[in-house]
A protein has these predicted regions:
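Short beta->alpha connector loops at strand-helix junctions that form conserved
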Residues: 117-119
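AMP-binding adenylation
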Residues: 1-4, 21
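Short, contiguous pre-domain boundary segments
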Residues: 21-31
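A short N-terminal helical cap/helix-turn-helix that marks the beginning
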Residues: 3-16, 34-55, 70, 74
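Conserved AMP-binding/adenylate-forming core of the ANL superfamily
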Residues: 35, 52-108, 122-127
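Structured binding elements
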Residues: 111
Length: 128
């Protein structure tokens, strides 16, 4: 396993693409990636550079990153128009459709907590 250890050191060691450092989180030392994005919103925004690349394939449907961002922006605007904003929670009870991801990104990129729920639950289970 010497090669594996060497690869890990090259990737996570000083100057590596995934360099790991120790940071302070509320007084607790935590290992973290030096170049990690600050939040999930930044992760989603970083994908704008792939505008014309395929983001999602579902059956015969294909969605580029640009199209996904347009839809996410539209969903976020709709949520805001409904009075849903930062700090609120939105339940997502849906099968594994592309729209699940789009709603998720719309929520977390605007400070809304996305709460994934099992789409097979009964109404009583969801209400609980």
């Amino acid at each position: 396993y010497a090669e594996l250890a060497q690869a890990r050191e090259e990737l996570t060691g000083p100057g590596g693409a995934f360099e790991i450092v120790t940071i302070d989180v509320r007084g607790v030392p935590v290992r973290a990636y030096r170049n990690a994005l600050p939040d999930v919103r930044a992760l989603w925004q970083s994908t704008r550079q792939f505008a014309e690349r395929t983001y999602i394939v579902y059956g015969d449907e294909r969605l580029t990153y640009r199209e996904a961002h347009d839809r996410v922006d539209a969903i976020a605007a709709w949520l805001a128009a409904q009075g849903v904003g930062r700090g609120d929670r939105v339940a997502i009870a849906m099968r594994n459709y592309p729209e699940w991801l789009l709603i998720y990104w719309a929520c977390v990129s605007t400070g809304i907590a996305a709460v994934g729920m099992n789409a097979w639950w009964t109404a009583a289970e969801m209400a609980y």
